[in-house]
Curated annotation (Swiss-Prot):
The keyword Methyltransferase does not apply. Belongs to the bacterial ribosomal protein bL33 family. GO terms for cellular component: cytosolic large ribosomal subunit. It comes from the Bacteria. This is Large ribosomal subunit protein bL33. The keyword Electron transport does not apply. GO terms for molecular function: structural constituent of ribosome. It comes from Pectobacterium atrosepticum (strain SCRI 1043 / ATCC BAA-672).
Amino acid sequence: MAKGVREKIKLVSSAGTGHFYTTTKNKRTKPEKLELKKFDPVVRQHVLYKEAKIK
């Protein structure tokens, strides 16, 4: 069986709360870093989440 192309990534809040989401992304089709606006429950607002590597 072939190994999947999708790699696990972590989306870290830019509000500095330490909150993060985990997701997967296809590195072959989207080599740039992912930035999404998502809800941060710590500050109770929609903030920018930036891609970081899962350690």
